[in-house]
Amino acid sequence: MNIVIISVVRDFAMYEKCIRTNPYCRGCEFAPIDNREMNAGIPVGYNSFLASRSANEDAWYVFCHEDWQPLENLGERLVDLDRESLWGGIGASTRVRWGIYHQWQLVGTVEECRKDGSNRRMIGCAVSTGTPVETFDCQCLIVHSSLIQRNALRFDEHLTFDLYVEDFCIAAKEKGIASRILPLSACHWSGGSVQPRYYEQERYVNEKYPNECFTGTSSWVLGGRPSILRMASVKVKTLFRKIREC
């Protein structure tokens, strides 16, 4: 079984630790995309990778952040997965109540910590393999090459560093492709804050999919809300995290 790990990289020290020298990635093909000079949006790098591959390739593609660290053997975990679905370790789902209230939930689990390894903690809720979600977090998306080629799936390059995997999931859903959780032990070395660009990119996704209720795993963002409430939801979650860290 062929597995290709694709990462857009600016911090090669972090990439080496989390991906290239990680024993749980042994046997995988590494496809790092050097982004130190261009600082292009991550979808640009991912799409350039897809354009470079054979249309007949038979492989699992693991699109992941440079600071996403698998903690169990990828090859063993991808055996017998349904090639007709998208897969990821952590995502989000919503339940709409009374047509207006959106109940939000993280689905799947991942450890996360700061860049220096401090404040390590588990987030999300454990679920069984194949549990459906609406969207995955951008830290990791697993998809078979045949599904991408057959459905002409690509990443939206307007979304530079946020929500590009969420967008990918929604676009795939419109083609009848489900997003499902693969329980996978991993650590995301990124406890960063929400940047101002996030709100512009979130507005873009809302306009692109006006009838979709999408969820942003890192920020509690729900499609369809007034912008002031979306921004408030981010600030509330950030406050709760700071309180927990004290």
Regions picked out by a protein language model, each given a short descriptive name:
Residues R120-V143:
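A recurrent flexible, glycine/aromatic-enriched loop bordering the glycosyltransferase active site
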Residues T135-C138, R150-I170, S179-H188:
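Donor nucleotide-sugar recognition loop
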Residues D58-Q69:
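Short beta-strand-to-loop acidic/aromatic patch adjacent to the donor-nucleotide binding site
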Residues Q69, N73-T109:
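Conserved donor NDP-sugar-binding/catalytic core segment of glycosyltransferases
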Residues I5-G27:
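Short, well-formed alpha-helical segments that are part of the catalytic scaffolds
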